[in-house]
Amino acid sequence: MADAAGRSGVEVLCIGTELLLGNIVNGNARWLAEELAALGLPHFRQTVVGDNRDRLIAEVREIASRSRVLITTGGLGPTPDDLTTEAIAAAFQTPLEERADVWADITAKSRSRGREPGPETRRQALLPVGATVLPNPTGTAPGMVWSPTDHFTVLTFPGVPSEMRAMWQATAAPWFRQSGLSSGVFVSRTLRFWGIGESTLAEQVRDLLNQTNPTVAPYAGRGEVKLRITACASDQPEALALVDETERDLRSRTGDLCFGADEASLASVVLAHLRARGETLAVAESCTGGGLGAELTAVPGSSQVLLGGVIAYANAVKCELLGVPSSLLEEVGAVSDPVAQAMAEGVRRLTGSDWALALTGIAGPGGGSDEKPVGLVHIAVAGPDGCESHPIRLAASQGRDWIRLVSAGEALNRLRLRLMAAESGQTHTEAEGH
């Protein structure tokens, strides 16, 4: 893809002082990176620049000296600090012209929303001479595709993620497919694992990590481990076939450690199992404080399975709502397997659910002891075939939020394994001892 001057690849320039200050997360950069990979476009660099005209001009010129294509996000609005179009034109000493068709579109969209466009909005109709409009189907700020030189093209998009994505799918993606810049079609899939560390998993699949097409790359996140498979081929079916083959190999090596792919969360997988079985779930939480319920209710359609939950922080609530005997709390303490079991059985009885999960532990930073340190969590799974509880010990150094997050994930994974065992005819004791 390199030209005679050595320019190659695509760069992304995200514009906005709010990005530099960390006021908002730069989700556009990640999304664009995935889209570029899917189109088989070599993507070498991402840059963030604030709302400063001189720095924008300098950055655009530098990118033009080394890359074939620049994609920008942000800075297309009507306010004085929206400088993207102006700076790009200035970088190539090209005048701006008001586009009557763009202004007519802005005016029509504004009026359809019950307002007249203000005079400041008129700057959104200015484009460099020779630029082609990239229509914005959902907002008023149009983008552009412009080749100021024979070997460099810039595409601009608004910073609002929904507008940027709609414009990309409608206009930019087709443009790239026809541009001849692609080096093939890339397909990626991410397998998700629970119950194994990143280094251990990497060692099990070391030979696959060393292959080149598809590539397999490990990374950890939110208590789980992920393996991203990426294949390149001349067309999508061929690339998909390569990914499918590697996925089958990985799943055969790792068994039920792999709980899903791509956007499938532990919660969504568990809910899908229960929905298919026509069964219901309830939760009782102490140390996670509703975090488990939040994971479940984040999944669309969870109301078909999840009946409800109880946050039983105080011992009195454990007794009064869940029926945990006060004598049991006095004998073994709230952070124990017997209490976790009593909580699970209590919420199952209270709601009439088929299955129940319960967690009680010490999330920290205080409250631990030598016998029951910070990071100790007891997790119970109750179902038609009985109730079991086992503890986990998590690193206190990881912090309270991490302990709560991983505890909720571990509870979901234990239920997943119990359901898989039930479906295969395995006993629940065998599943809990997995």
Curated annotation (Swiss-Prot):
Entry-linked Pfam families:
CinA, CinA_KH, MoCF_biosynth
- Organism's domain of life? Bacteria
SUPFAM superfamilies per record: CinA-like, Molybdenum cofactor biosynthesis proteins
* InterPro entries for the chain: CinA, CinA-like_C, CinA_C, CinA_KH, Competence-induced_CinA, MoaB/Mog-like_dom_sf, MoaB/Mog_dom
| Membership in a protein family | Belongs to the CinA family.
- What is the protein named? CinA-like protein
